[in-house]
Amino acid sequence: IINSAAKVGGIYANDTQGTSFLIENLKININILESIINLPKVSLINLGSSCIYPLNAPNPINENSFMGGILEPTNSPYAMAKLTAIELGKTLKKDYGHNIINIMPTNLYGPNDNFDDLNSHVIPGLISRMHQAKLKNERDFNIWGTGKPLREFLYVDDLAEAIKFISKEKINTDLINVGSGVEISIKELAEKIKLTIGFN
C-alpha cells in the first residue's frame, strides 16, 4: 500500500488554513492506518513531508534531525498531522507487526501541479504569478520574501522511482528522506523561471 493522500498547499495556504490542514490530514492518515489494524501483516509506504523537521535543522536535513526542535510556524499544523502518521505507523509495527516505512520527500514539482496563486507550492506559484505579470506587461515582480532561503526540489517522476526502489528493498528504518541533494535559493529559482518564461 502506498499512502500519498493529503490536503496540500503552499506557504500562504498553510498559514491561513492551519485548522483545515491539521484536521483533514489527521482524518486521512488515521482512516488509512486504522483500516489495516486487523489485516494480516501489511507493508505500507506513507508519504510525509520535509516540513516535519525543525525550523533550524542543519542543511542538508537528515533523518537524525527528526523531533529535534520547534517546527516552522506557518506549516506546523500540516507537519503535526504528518508526525502523527509517523507515530501511528510505529505503533502499528510494534503492536501488530505491520511494516510501515515513512518517506519524506523534499519539495516536489511536475505535471498536474497546482498553479493557483494562493494555494500552490513555490515552483508552480512562481511560474503562474510571473506568467500573469508578463501577460499584464508588468515591469516588477515580487517573489515574496528575501529570495535567500535555500530549497531542494525533486521532480515527481523521480519520487515515483524512489518509491518503487524502496518498495522492493528490505529497509531497516522507518524514516527515509528522498530528495535531489541539490539546493537552490528562491531568488535563483525565480531567475531561471524568468529566463524560461521570457519575463523582462
Enumerate the predicted regions with their spans.
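Conserved Rossmann-fold NAD(P)-dependent oxidoreductase catalytic core, especially the SDR/UDP-sugar
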Residues: 3, 30-75, 101
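Structural signature of the Rossmann-like NAD(P)-dependent dehydrogenase/reductase core
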Residues: 3, 43-48, 101-107, 142-145, ...
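Conserved catalytic-core motifs of eukaryotic protein kinase domains, centered on the activation segment
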Residues: 11-19, 55-60, 112-115
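Hydrophobic positions on the long internal alpha-helix
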Residues: 28, 32-36, 88-89, 162, ...
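Conserved beta-loop-beta element that borders a ligand/cofactor-binding pocket
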Residues: 48-49, 86-114, 124-127, 135-143
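Active-site helix of classical SDR
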Residues: 77, 81-84
